[in-house]
Amino acid sequence: MTTLIRRGRRAEEGQERRADSEDSIKDKDEEESADSKDIRLTLMEEVLLLGLKDKEGYTSFWNDCISSGLRGGILIELFLRGRVVLEPATIRKKRLIDKKVLLKSDKLTGDVLLDETIKHMKATEPAETVQSWIELLTGETWNPFKLQYQLRNVRERIAKNLVEKGILTTEKQNFLLFDMTTHPVTNTTEKQRLVKKLQESLLERWVNDPHRMDKRTLSLLVLAHSSDVLENAFSSLSDEKYDMAMNRSKELLELDPDTEGMKPNACEMIWAVLSAFNKS
């Protein structure tokens, strides 16, 4: 009897070790997946693709939100790739809007915009908040000494990445007094996949809990809303489904970021970016 108990215990211990090993491998895979080639588009590329008019190849002239939205995407992308974190909460700094962005790893990603931002953060002392970084990267600062942090030609650089990935093409269009480089969509399948993912997240796959949603999908919803391109993804829906998707997205985006950011397994940076846009 004693021998059987010992064998049973050894078997249980072996199963536990295998389970722990599998969990650690899974965690490692999830950490490394952000830098793998499986993730075809960055959040910035997805936001720009949603905002582009398919045939014309440019974003709406009236959209003045997408620039800051793309910078918010850079911060979330760096967070998801394990390059930055938010400082721990303290008595004086409980709100996400007050927390500084800390550089966790200065390992370059291979993406020019992300790597340029990493270099800026590495050279910045003291650290800045999420809202400050969005303003600095956009160039919306009154401090002439901080204009060096502005990321220039962001839309054009992202569009070129999408051209290299075979999703856009490059053309020249004449607008009365000037010529403009445009980037019409050539791979409509990829854009449709993106639109379908957003639609399903608020319709067929709606979970009514942001913390159960895929982090990149939640990020894209926040960024698309902040960039004023979210409605573009719902234009093909019937009136009933359109209203449902808009109501659910509104319900999601009106949650209190500080409350959501404190919940277990919350992706703090997503809520910090939403909080920053709510304050701006």
UniProtKB/Swiss-Prot annotation:
Membrane-topology annotation of the record: Peripheral membrane protein
Feature: compositional bias, Basic and acidic residues: 10-32
GO CC terms, sorted: cytosol; Golgi cisterna; Golgi cisterna membrane; Golgi membrane; trans-Golgi network
A matching Pfam family: GPP34
Classification via InterPro entries: GPP34-like, GPP34-like_sf
Major location category of this protein: Golgi
UniProt-annotated location(s): Golgi apparatus, Golgi stack membrane; Golgi apparatus, trans-Golgi network membrane
Gene3D superfamilies assigned: yeast vps74-n-term truncation variant domain like
UniProtKB keywords: Golgi apparatus, Lipid-binding, Membrane
Protein origin, superkingdom: Eukaryota
Entry similarity comment: Belongs to the GOLPH3/VPS74 family.
Protein name listed in UniProt: Golgi phosphoprotein 3-like A
